[in-house]
Amino acid sequence: EAEWVHGSMGGTAGARHGLLSRVAWTEDDDLAGPQPSALKDPNAFGLFDTLGNVWEWCWDRLDPARYGDYRVLKGGGWADPEWSCRVGVRRGNAPDARVEDAGFRVARGPVATDDELDGGQGWSERADRHRASIRGPLPVGWTPLT
């Protein structure tokens, strides 16, 4: 969730990274569903649609004591009022839920050289070559290098 917030803010300090009508699809647009990406203005990091359009899944749990495995959703959606399309607003749902106003953003940290690989996520040129050579179903989650 913290990574999502950092990316969505795009280096700004406010609840939004620009005039909402220029950066997000909300209920004010009277839409029947989500819109194609990148039709509104990006933030300073070059990211589009971090607010409005669809809520974005985060890996963090919403409140484990109360909701168990529910995961955090951020950003607001195309059918939501302006107040919910702010960086600080959060919602949650079960990880296997199917909802029309939620999606996900594929994100990846920087790729390390083999010398810089610290065992964290295993992202390096060597790790990527190894994963590309796997035949058949890909392993779920982190793939250790053997």
PLM segments and residue spans:
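Functional-site microenvironments in short loops/helix caps that host divalent-cation chemistry
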Residues: 1-89, 100
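Disulfide-stabilized, aromatic/cysteine-rich ligand-recognition loop
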Residues: 41-43, 66-146
